[in-house]
Amino acid sequence: MHSILFATSEAYPLIKTGGLADVAASLPRALLKLGHDVRILLPAYESLLAKAASQGLKTLGEISLDDINLTLHQTRLPGTRVTVWLVDIPEFSARAGNPYCGADGNDWYDNHLRFYWFARAAEAIALNQAGLNWQPDIVHCNDWQTGLIPALLSLHPERPATLFTIHNLAYRGLFSYQAFGELNLPPAFWHHERLEFYGQMSFMKGGLAFADFITTVSPSYAQEIQLPEHGYGLDGLIRYRQESLSGILNGIDTDEWNPGKDKHLAATYNRRTLGNKTKNKLALQETLGLALNADVPLLGFIGRLVDQKGIDLILNQLPLLLEQDCQLVVLGSGFPHYEQRLREVARQYPDRVSVTIGYDEGLAHQIEAGCDIFLMPSIFEPCGLNQMYSLRYGTLPVVHAVGGLKDTVQERPLDNPGEDANGFVFHSPDALDLHAAILRALDAYRQPATWKQLQINAMNRDSSWEQSAKAYEAIYANLCS
């Protein structure tokens, strides 16, 4: 059994902007079930404090660092036994809105200071200098917001082991040399083998350079980020550290995403009652104002309407797709020009295309259950969660062969799908390649026996966090040996 400080900038349902929040909710819970002592460390954002208050919030005391005092609160991750510690400074708790940026979409001007103090709090806890009478064996850090923690702990000979997980290398936590000067960091950290990155400071690089071990969220992504085209200038450092790098697929919350018990659905179902899936399709069509037709293929997309998610590929092949007898459902928000183009298509084809701008958790579940085919043409995808939700719901994904999509979705010839074929894969980020994969999916849909076999294969896949947690457990054991 190990004691683990799990440092993260978000954790569902307390605060969420992306997939990191889902991981930070599920992995600690899975580790707790394996017998480990896990404490989550989060910034005390204003909105988070309001949610935590309903769970019960206890102030543990203050941590004095240099010329400021940080307040430490304690709560629990809702619905679990996982302890959560909250680092409270006014730059977190007295600022409404997004954790990282203002309403105008620009990063908060003082993010370097905000997450520096968060790292200093983690350092104090890790060294048992926070008055908690608790010290972890391992500090598990996540993405750039925690990248300074391994760097700071490297200054102490007697310290816990450090693990740094890359969830998305595209966000490198870049700040100016002037910002570096505002932090009480050793001048030696301004070096190309440490935090300096082409004249800037990179918090992400701090995690990569100083952590004892590095993981990322899928085996394929671990390989891709060692290449210049996917490394964002950090590929050389990652190649240098490849012996201390492992890719571990994320799991999904199989209680929250369970078609057999999902409260959001018109009808629950499992592998033996797949016929009930049609009831969800008809309910979704009715809810969204589409033509009611159990036989027409219904395609879905859920995600940010940004270039990374391949929404332009969907839009560019849409005229060809609409020549087919099918329907399309889109849920998401993002770049205004993508939102506008999608709205125009929905107005033009009101009984065939539905577009909901924003995010609705219930509707997301209904799309996963009601659709036949799920589109995930991401240009890059470190792990991806929606393809695993789709597999669990027997909704066959069409994916671009990158990152975690490549590791979870397999395509085989329809005349011999075997037991591992569970979707459709295209290999270049091109609208025509995506369209060809969709046509293969539509062809399979017209073969009911084959389609059902693919659905059963998909639903048989184990996407639970238990497998992922055991892989992390093995790394923890090696770090502590």
Swiss-Prot record:
Keyword Iron part of the UniProt annotation: no
EC id: 2.4.1.21
Binding-site residues, ADP-alpha-D-glucose: 16
Keyword entries, A-Z: Glycogen biosynthesis, Glycosyltransferase, Transferase
Transmembrane segments: none
InterPro entries per UniProt: Glyco_trans_1, GS/SS, Starch_synth_cat_dom
GO BP: glycogen biosynthetic process
Pfam families: Glyco_transf_5 (PF08323), Glycos_transf_1 (PF00534)
Protein family: Belongs to the glycosyltransferase 1 family. Bacterial/plant glycogen synthase subfamily.
Biological role stated in the UniProt entry: Synthesizes alpha-1,4-glucan chains using ADP-glucose.
Protein name: Glycogen synthase
Organism of origin: Cellvibrio japonicus (strain Ueda107) (Pseudomonas fluorescens subsp. cellulosa)
